[in-house]
């Protein structure tokens, strides 16, 4: 059995969070470019392990398949020694698990509406679609404000070093104007995200995905 993780993802996508976690912990892995918007990518290979063709999709060393960013990060955190991606303290760990569910449920889901507003209304004219996007973006930014108020840094959300929740927040907050909004309305949390971005163990991955 190989000890290598196989990650299906694409540049600038949510797979960056999983890639960052694997890289930060020096876990052997290989990234395969695959996405429905990249027709020349390894879509058939992705479809074979995940019929939904969603990324990230992670094939574990034992051959089992994991999907959903939060589920993958939780499993990696449980697999590694306590205190690495998830805190060792049970109460702190419970809050990090809460945050890992909060982001997909309240933030990631809103981004999908902003990206594809035509899926969420019968009114297909441009004005109606823009109204859906604007309303959803406002709600998304409010959800991030609530997140910032609920999850204190110590100095990072996960403790002394960036953990799973720090990584996921740093990735998902890059979309839909969230960083600019947080810089104005939650500057301390915005500063935390920048610290995660520039952390030496994560910076190479984020640079690969966002050229910054």
For each predicted feature, which ranges?
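Positions that flank functional sites
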Residues: 36-37, 162, 211
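Residues at helix-coil transition
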Residues: 77-81, 152, 197-198
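GST-like fold's C-terminal all-alpha helical module
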Residues: 99, 103-195
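Active-site-flanking alpha-helical
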Residues: 77, 172-173, 206
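GST-like domain detector, emphasizing the conserved glutathione-binding G-site
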Residues: 1-128
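Long hydrophobic alpha-helical segments typical of transmembrane helices together
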Residues: 188-212
